[in-house]
């Protein structure tokens, strides 16, 4: 059996996000505002499905954080619950006490994203009993966060009502940022096999990834193949995987059932290894060893994992797998892994992105065919190349993202942008995505001049803002946002 490593700690994409909550107040403002805002906030978090950590009502005056003593209590609670807390939400029902808030965060030292919200004043309630002045207080709080070097996320509007749809959207955005930051800082990526010798483009630095909290767990491809060969054809896990494959897409009648069986066994072993090592994503040596030494492609196994929120990248592109994971955490949508592959006639802002492919079915957006690799099939023999997931990606919104370890500079760099998939035809085999991106030539120039790989991760929604906030502000990677 494969060895077990430490506990896998990536939050599931669909799991609850937990916020540490700080409600601020300042003594000469009406304390009722703080009490009411706390009640409104907790009701909203409950309704939206978020968990939270907050001081008990009787722990401080007015159920809020104001004094240094309050801050010490709140920070101690946050430290006790630090493994649960994905981010901190700071709410200002009134001007708030900047020292109480910044002292809480400084003492807790959670190193998680922080959201700062300030409540709106009403024109008919700016007397002594009703005025909030949070519009001003937010500036003071943010000034202190800046002084202490604590990065934070702002709401879309400078002030907003806690019960508003705008604040609900702010919380959703912030929760996604928290998922990306927590997920990547604790990510465990499987590297199955060695990179293709001909592709130096996918070389990377494990040490730079580890510096951001990303652990790479390698395994020799021979171990995977050896265990796949030892599996009994009638094993329950194999039969279940065969059923899953048959329901996943259309398999042409010409395909030998034994080749489907090989694919099922390979998938079972890879799944088991991923589970045993508590891995969040993988990158696989998908040619030519697995075809020559085992007799099938790896694409379908990768597609099936991706469909279950375990992204898998081609050609042992480990950093590509991290890029896919980032998109998954930001969007909740299954990502694909593609080559920037072809121009599209004379359309300057359109290109064809392709792979053999390992596209998950949800990423494809329509039914898929499962057949042989085309180019490799010609040289390696089609009988050794079953397992390619084929089709044309359906039209719709798209976000693309790619990170890379820049060993010459000792940094992690990335690029990011949004575009759309189109239904324009492209008569090529494999997985095809025709993409429209504004100022595409400018983007390609940036990739060329800055040494980025030919691989890119994409997902079927717009989520660039979330990734930009998480990566540039909290992870500290060098980021180019296109467009």
Q: How would you label these PLM feature ranges?
A:
Residues 39, 380-483:
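Extended hydrophobic packing segments that form well-structured cores
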Residues 240-330:
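Long, internal scaffold/assembly segments composed of regular secondary structure
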Residues 84-94, 115-117, 279-285:
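Periplasmic-binding protein-like
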Residues 52-77, 226-235:
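N-terminal beta-loop-helix "entrance" segment that forms/cooperates
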